[in-house]
Amino acid sequence: RSLREIRIGTLRYSEPIASSGLIASIGGLYAEARPGGIIRPLDVRSHVASISLRLRYPLLRQRNQSLFLEGGIAANSTQTDILNTRLISDRQTVIDASLLWQQSGWLDGTTTASLGIYHGTGLFGAMSRSASHPSVAGFDPRFTRVSLLGQRLQRLIGPFSAYASVQGQYSK
């Protein structure tokens, strides 16, 4: 594989705010893809960029469990060209809030559960409903999505463990 096929860079910085446990973070991502193989003659080129600001606050902190309230805003951009013709051009700004519960020790395992709500906005140059080249026809940039996640890592006998994960989402 060539290093030209995919390149990804991410940065994240977190800083505690006061003594309450509040943590602020900023993150960024940039990725380029130029697939080879049998689609190389199509000259597919994709570019993805994202920047996010987040806050995380501990509602409950105990030795064996924690409950966090987290929220943030992310501005995302995706562009894909084929044969020098724009196929996809998405720009989204998403505000989100979630509750995250983490527990360890019960039956010698760890459990994580989260509930999140995400809402698309028109901020920071987000595309409109009439934008050309969206990745999904009729895409509404002011969408709402609710997601659920449950994970369990269970220690078994000796060096063995089992992992299970369940996720679901509803979009409107």
Predicted segments, located by residue:
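Transmembrane beta-strand segments of outer-membrane beta-barrel domains in Gram-negative
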Residues: 16, 21-171
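Gly/Pro-enriched, hydrophobic low-complexity segments
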Residues: 10, 14-16
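Solvent-exposed loop/turn segments connecting transmembrane beta-strands
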Residues: 1-8
